[in-house]
Amino acid sequence: MEIKTPSFRVETLDKSKTYHHHEYPQIILGLMGKSELSIEDSSVCLSPGMGYRINANVEHSFSGTSNNQVLVMNLPPFISMTDVEQFGNSYFSLDARTHQLISLLATELKEHADDSLLSQSISNTLQCLIKRSLMLFDEKKVERLNMVLIDNYIEQHLQKKISVAELSSVAFLAQSQFYALFKSQMGITPHQYVLRKRLDLAKQLIAERQKPLSQVAQLCGFSSQSSFSQAFRRLYGMSPTRYQFFIR
């Protein structure tokens, strides 16, 4: 399909993933709910106000939870090369005001799809807003991660699995960019950092002597007491049982 001008559509994504690619670039923007973009062995979580630029001929898939809505922008190759790909970030976010305005315009676009004049006016406005957002976001070069935000997210979700994709969404970065910046700043990988957070909490709970080790393992997000014991021993050189006895 040849695209000569940018085109927009509003979609609700289902839970299934179907990989595909096309000869034109795309920008996908979260409007409501939560969606996930899988691209080149990475996953990107798209919450409302978060967007991602997909280059032409790149294999990708979309999926979403219930009540999600995304705005899809198909781009002609010449616009992509001159007006979009000059910006380094594939992953970007909108400020609250711009997100609200784009959401309202997307609703109008969906409800009045048969009005060609209105649709063209809305499309032009959307194109300008998204281009401006890409420019503003690219100017905000991320040099250091906000570890307070990341730590807060980790602490609130320690009882479950925490993926790099989730943490990168908190930092408003693409997964690969977040991983490299995190390792450079902290000296360890995100996975190792989360594991240490789990084990730090485990030590604290064991010291309080109010919960059995099986419950400690569960509260700290380990799939089994065995995996908890192995991780604890690797980091601290003794088993949780031994540590429990040692601090009495």
From Swiss-Prot:
Q: Which InterPro entries match?
A: AraC_XylS_family_regulators, Cupin_2, Homeodomain-like_sf, HTH_AraC, HTH_AraC-typ_CS, RmlC-like_jellyroll, RmlC_Cupin_sf, Tscrpt_reg_AraC-type_HTH
Instruction: List, for all copies, the residue spans of the domain called HTH araC/xylS-type.
Output: 148-246
Family annotation (SUPFAM superfamilies): Homeodomain-like (SSF46689), RmlC-like cupins (SSF51182)
Give me the disulphide-bonded residues.
none
Keywords, in A-Z order: DNA-binding, Transcription, Transcription regulation
Question: Per its UniProt record, what Gene3D superfamilies does this chain match?
Answer: Homeodomain-like, Jelly Rolls
Superkingdom of this entry's organism? Bacteria
Please give the DNA-binding region boundaries: 165-186, 213-236
Q: What Pfam family is a match for this entry?
A: Cupin_2
A single GO molecular function term of this UniProt record: DNA-binding transcription factor activity
What function does the entry list? Answer: Probable transcriptional regulator. Its target gene(s) is not yet known.
Name by which UniProt lists this protein: Probable transcriptional regulator LumQ
Which organism does this record belong to? Photobacterium leiognathi
The uppermost taxa in this organism's lineage are: Bacteria, Pseudomonadati, Pseudomonadota, Gammaproteobacteria, Vibrionales
